[in-house]
Amino acid sequence: MIEILLDPFRYDFMIRSLITAFASGAMLSLLGPFTINRNMGFMADAMAHATLPIIAVGVFLGFSISELGVPAAILIAIFLGLIIKNTNVGEDTAIGIIFSSFFALGFVLISLLNVTVNLEDLLFGQILAVNISDVYIVVSLLILVILVTVTYFKQLLFYSFDPIGAEVKGLNTTFLNYLFLILLSIAIVGSLQTVGIILVLSMLIIPAAAAKLVTETFTASIGVSVLFGTISSITGLYLSYFLNLPSGPSMSLVATTIFVIAFLSKKIRKKGSLATVTVS
């Protein structure tokens, strides 16, 4: 058993991939509970798709996806925030417009600029292709997300549950909103090479949703979400290695399996509690 677990460590590319998978899984699942609490799943998906034109231009200029992380995240977060704030068509409608138009623009730019990029890797991730520079960047982004989240945890928590109350209390809600959007964009862009544009939402939402089913408090759900997210990433990568499966979809399916187990576990516990009450 130990030999099986250690086998991937014989290869440098697998060591890089495992570190990146852990960092991406932790980064996304850390922000997942906040995203669910604020009903921002659709927004997060739009952010992922909005990265495509930036990636197209960046790759054309000679940058890697990881190197585009922070500047792309800031641009996307600010742009989305401004569009939603200054339009009267409704938040979901504005996000839907951004989602589809930016995704379409990305493919047009890839064609016009004659960018050499593997679309399957872009959409579903190709973690096995990460280099040492990508590893340093993704780990640095994880540290940045953790530090900022810990520093502003109480404010983000208050704003997440009660935006109006936070504003009444004197918190700068505009700053907190853009701060979270930037953190979310950083996590998404930093994880694109791991799970791709299509599946990044699954690694953001599913571990957090599973954690919500098995915990009683929001703070506890964050810790459990990170645990589920990292387990999903590492286990998915192991499955990819031993069964020759695509890494991104494997991670997503492991996360889904954890969610199903958590869901069934809660149902069983609930039935057990009702049976105990009935007998009493």
Residue ranges and their predicted role:
Residues F13-T20, L119-I146:
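Loop-to-helix entry region at the N-terminal start of transmembrane alpha-helices
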Residues P33-V115, K212-G223, S240-L243, K267-I268:
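Short loop segments and helix-boundary regions at transmembrane helix junctions
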Residues L147-F180:
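Membrane-helix/interface signature in polytopic inner-membrane proteins
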Residues S17, S66-A73, D92-G96, V139, ...:
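Loop-to-transmembrane alpha-helix initiation sites
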Residues M1-A26, S273-T276:
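Membrane-interfacial amphipathic/re-entrant helices at transmembrane-helix boundaries
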Residues I198-P249:
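Transmembrane alpha-helical segments in multi-pass inner-membrane proteins
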Residues I2-Y11, T116-V130, Y238-Y241:
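Membrane-interface helix termini and inter-helical loops of multi-pass transporters
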Residues L245-S252, T256-S280:
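Cytosolic-side transmembrane-helix boundaries in multi-pass membrane proteins
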